[in-house]
């Protein structure tokens, strides 16, 4: 599964990339961007399974980026990282279907659990797709 990271702080991007590289299995670090505009371009070109994004960034914030991708019909799971515990951010993220909302600093354990949760969701959705196609054919 392909993951991209959209984060304005280079040290955080590098740290996340290193964590993904450490993980064994089907996770592949597929790219990174430093703001929402560049992140949206990356989403369009790579079509990742998962986007890990900050909220507040220059040019376009993470939630705007995810909303723009969804409006274009790009279905992607998202992990939102935020230094802000304001409820409004979390509520907006939940309304958009964000899979995980993690507060910085994120522990390694939290990060791995979030990705495992997403992996499980993706697998369940893939198993349900043939069932849905079969019911449409009847």
What are these regions (language model features)?
Residues 7, 54:
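Active-site residues of response regulator receiver
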Residues 10-31, 45:
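Two-component/phosphorelay signaling modules centered on CheY-like receiver
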Residues 32-41, 62-65:
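Helix N-cap/capping motif at the beta->alpha junctions
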Residues 51, 78, 93, 101-102:
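Two-component signal transduction core modules
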Residues 57:
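Receiver (REC) domain active-site loop signature in two-component systems and cognate sites
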Residues 64, 85-100:
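Alpha4 helix (beta4-alpha4-beta5 surface) of REC/receiver domains from two-component response regulators
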Residues 94, 98-100, 106-138:
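Interdomain helical linkers/hinges and coiled-coil/dimerization scaffolds
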């Amino acid at each position: 599964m392909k993951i991209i990271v959209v984060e304005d702080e280079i040290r955080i991007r590098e740290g996340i990339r290193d964590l993904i590289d450490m993980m064994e299995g089907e996770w592949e670090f597929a790219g990174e961007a430093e703001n929402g505009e560049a992140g949206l371009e990356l989403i369009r070109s790579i079509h990742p399974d998962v986007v890990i994004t900050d909220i507040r960034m220059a040019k376009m914030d993470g939630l705007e980026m995810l909303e723009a991708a969804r409006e274009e019909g790009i279905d992607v799971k998202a992990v939102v990282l935020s230094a802000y515990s304001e409820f409004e951010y979390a509520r907006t993220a939940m309304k958009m279907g964000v899979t995980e909302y993690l507060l910085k600093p994120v522990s390694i354990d939290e990060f791995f659990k979030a990705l495992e949760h997403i992996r499980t969701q993706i697998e369940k959705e893939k198993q349900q797709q043939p069932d849905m196609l079969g019911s449409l054919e009847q």
